[in-house]
């Protein structure tokens, strides 16, 4: 997967094309496709992102080594290895989450296509929606999550990423922006190497006056 394609992949993944069965959801741009499985009672998983595919190609993805099989929103709890998108402490002090798909909704708005994957914890009254919004006439999908604490007592969120996406080893590039007063939005492109890449600033609420990394 190359970050030099026309499709935006920070939290942007393609144009929603609809579910193919009870669990397969294919999102496509003119040049790329994203395949997600979201079967009720199971983990929601990314299965493929790369060159554009059609419905008839899906079985070939599963039969090959191309399928990701990676949770679309991994949380700290039962499985703790690897990077987690969310970590919480419940009112009783337990730090475990075990989210499974409850339902998936797709609908259209004036701005584009929407897909909501609602997940619930198997023990606690905790739910999460992973939302994808495909804007009309673009190659952009924004994605974010909404958290629901349906218990009577508060819980503490220690980590809450807006998105999680796996990147397979390869010739992958990242485009990002930085700057300072009078020279904002300077674009950089760099090849992704092993390890983590962190883009941040410490200016807090005044970050748009100087360095605003993205």
Protein language model regions, located:
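Bacterial N-terminal signal peptides that target proteins for export
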Residues: 1-9
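Hydrophobic h-region of N-terminal signal peptides that target proteins for export
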Residues: 12-20
